[in-house]
Amino acid sequence: MLKIFNTLTSTKEIFTPIKKNRVNLYVCGVTVYDFCHIGHGRTFVVFDMIVRYLRFSGFQVKYVRNITDIDDKIISKSTKEKKKINTFTASMIKEMHKDFDLLGISVPDEEPRVTDYIDNIIRIITTLIKKKHAYIHKNGDVIFSIDSDPNYGTLSRQSLTSLESGSRIPLNNMKKNPLDFILWKSSNKEEYSWDSPWGKGRPGWHIECTAITNVFFNNSIDIHGGGSDLLFPHHENERSQSICFNNKSMINFWMHTGMVILNNKKMSKSLGNVYFLRNILKDCDAEVLRYFFLSTHYRHPIYYCEKNLDQAYTSLKYLYTALYDTNPFFNNEEGLNFELEFYNAMNDDFNTPAVFSIFFKIARKINFLKNKDILKTNKFAFRLKYLANNLGFLFQDPKEFLQKKTTLNLLTLKEIQLLIEKRNIARQSKLWQEADNIRKKLMSLDIILEDLPDKTIWRKNKKS
């Protein structure tokens, strides 16, 4: 019996699809103004895992992940690069697919682009105005009134009073409430504006998902997902306008992935600590990164550092070592008890850390049987590969994986630490040239040192 943590109720609930054996799943996709970063990777690997498991469990899944191909950042970036918006977004979507393919993220059933659904967006906004959930500003903007929804703040568990007290109202503010948000943004520039009853303009961010989910799911969604950074205001606003448009809640479960933490800080462009997937994957095997993403429960923050990446590599190396020199390609009933444990872990809100511990138990069994019982060894090897494949793992040839270099490429963790210790000794002895030479050697290998009062820490230079 599958249980999923529902953000709306803040509890684990038994998952019962709206239609028997069918799951409608929607995930907020990428705004394609730049390359995909590690936060995108974490979220979409998680939902790829969820879709794979639901299908493995016998559900027919309709998976839709949108693409935002019009917004202020896209306009700014395309202008800067002197490209037409359509040309720019097409190239960024292509790059997004390259990154996701490397990570083994399956293509969703539908990947709608916002600009293909402008008519649907206008229709919904028109209805919201008629129902007095939205108002038109004199400049042509259409704005959603959060005061028209008495349940606003329910999803993110925030009261209107506390939200309003934390907002600052600018002079000449065009909104009735500072938390009101744009549904339609007035714009007269031809390349990124469309005709509407309120004049030329383009859609606001939040209305996009409401329009697309209405088109593809006919007001009926089992699971809506995204990163926890989208919970407020994006998902709160989306839910509010969707309920006001449809006169009911159309989403049963809300799921959110935890943040990626870098050097004890949330990843953020403003902090200058955004790591692009393609830069990380230059010297990290894609399956290692995928394993890293799922080694922490999807709802929890995940701490990105070389040590944790190296740990993911070591874990995968152990599993591939168990599969090495086996023939796991025939079905059998050996190890079904492990499969039951696998189901129990996955049915507990997709508990992948527990699943990985089960994989290790099977691997230990294989290692124990090697050179003792070839037939049983191969049977358990099948069970390990069969279960792991269904989550997107262990597709590589074991020999090829084991011959690859580690995630650090040229240096092991131990070698790096030895060099740092040697440099510390040189500094204590005031051998500044020797210490500087070691720093330069590490820098040439993209190892960045940071001297603290009591120790020296290091990181791999994978910044954008």
Curated annotation (Swiss-Prot):
Family matches, as PANTHER family: CYSTEINE--TRNA LIGASE, CYTOPLASMIC, CYSTEINYL-TRNA SYNTHETASE
Summarize where ATP binds, as residue positions: 269
Q: Which gene encodes it?
A: cysS
Xref: NCBIfam families: cysS
Q: Name one GO molecular function term.
A: zinc ion binding
What name does this protein carry? Cysteine--tRNA ligase
Q: Which cofactor does it need?
A: Zn(2+)
Please name the HAMAP family in this protein's record: Cys_tRNA_synth
Q: Which domain of life is it from?
A: Bacteria
What organism, scientifically named, is this protein from?
A: Buchnera aphidicola subsp. Acyrthosiphon pisum (strain 5A)
* Annotated binding of Zn(2+), by residue: 28, 209, 234, 238
How does it associate, per the subunit comment?
Monomer.
User: Which catalytic reaction applies to this protein?
Assistant: tRNA(Cys) + L-cysteine + ATP = L-cysteinyl-tRNA(Cys) + AMP + diphosphate
Q: What class of enzyme is it?
A: ligase
Q: Name one GO biological process term.
A: cysteinyl-tRNA aminoacylation
